[in-house]
Amino acid sequence: IKDKLLKAMNENDGFLQEIDFKKYKINSGAPLVSSYRNNLVFTAGPPSGGGVVLLTSLNILSAYDLSKYGSNSTATYHLIAEALRRGHNNRSHHIGDPSFYDIPINDLLSKERTKEFIKSISFDKATPSSKVRPLRITNESRDTTHYSIVDKDGNAVSNTY
């Protein structure tokens, strides 16, 4: 895989070199774990932000009996959109590389935060993203690169920088 990446970099004026692969150290962390309707949900923790979006959204949705609204109803889609909006708020304002940032993961996924989010959802209208309150204000760089590779033997690597 490394040789193919380096070949592609060389052919396309890329910036990765052999030394970058030699210096690279793999970081792995514990997964985030939560429950949703009596099912355990395991997902990637920071620096990946998707897990926080997923668990925040599921924590919010667990407060609603979605079957009451029907699987294809406006109310169900509205709740899913509102939950995802709040999940993305948690990700956008608070997730980064834990090697460099203090990430308040327990606060982000807490019952108290979930209750605040649930109280802020209206069935009458969509919440403007600007009105979803971050836990605290942080500045996020706009420079992120991510790639995941799986080879024919099932070996996998995921990299975000």
Identify the meaning behind each predicted range.
Residues 44-52, 74, 144:
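Short, conserved micro-motifs enriched in small and acidic residues
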Residues 49-56, 86:
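Extended, domain-scale alpha-helical bundle/helix-rich regions
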Residues 1-46, 122-129, 133-139, 147-155:
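Accessory "access/gating" subregions that flank catalytic or transport cores
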Residues 56-63:
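Short glycine/serine- and small hydrophobic-enriched flexible loop segments
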Residues 14, 63-161:
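Internal maturation/activation junctions in enzymes
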